[in-house]
A protein has these predicted regions:
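Active-site loop immediately N-terminal to the catalytic Tyr-X3-Lys motif
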Residues: 11-15
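Active-site-adjacent segment of SDR/Rossmann-fold oxidoreductases
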Residues: 9, 30-41
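Short, flexible catalytic-loop segment of classical short-chain dehydrogenase/reductase
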Residues: 47-57, 61-62
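Active-site helix of classical SDR
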Residues: 20
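Catalytic tyrosine of NAD(P)H-dependent dehydrogenase/reductases that use a Tyr as the general acid/base
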Residues: 17, 25
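C-terminal helical subdomain
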Residues: 44, 62-101
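Residue(s) in the substrate-gating loop at a strand-loop-helix junction
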Residues: 4
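A transmembrane-helix-recognition feature enriched in membrane-embedded lipid enzymes
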Residues: 88-121
């Protein structure tokens, strides 16, 4: 299942997207545990900012400039994670994204939320 690094943190102006991706992550991790005794592999992959049309659609390319992975890099990272001898319940693409996801869980929300709000501008819903 495809999640996102937004699953690891609240994202002002993308609240529904972040919540949906958090659901995918949590659901997949639970299913990973439940299904493994039956020989079924369930996996959640969380790419970070990826060079696609997504940022063009929301009108914000500046947020992730310099941190974006290509779609090929993301796909290769996902396949590497799936190819491990023991597939983990989830994986994040890229070392920088994995560090960011881990730190987002450690930083108090009262500190994290204003920083995220400053780095993201609201989506223009009138387009």
């Amino acid at each position: 299942n495809v999640s996102s690094t937004t699953a690891y943190q609240p994202v002002p102006s993308l609240a529904v997207y972040a919540a949906a991706k958090a659901f995918v992550l949590s659901f997949s991790q639970s299913l990973w545990y439940e299904a493994r005794q039956h020989g079924v592999t369930v996996f959640s992959f969380a790419p970070g900012p990826t060079h696609t049309e997504f940022f063009d659609v929301i009108g914000d390319n500046a947020t992730a400039v310099g941190r974006m992975q290509s779609a090929d890099q993301v796909a290769a990272a996902g396949l590497r994670a799936l190819d491990r001898r023991f597939t983990p319940p989830s994986a994040v693409s890229g070392v920088g994204n994995a560090i960011t996801a881990a730190l987002a869980r450690l930083v108090p929300r009262r500190v994290l939320m204003p920083a995220l709000a400053r780095s993201l501008r609201p989506v223009d819903t009138k387009r």
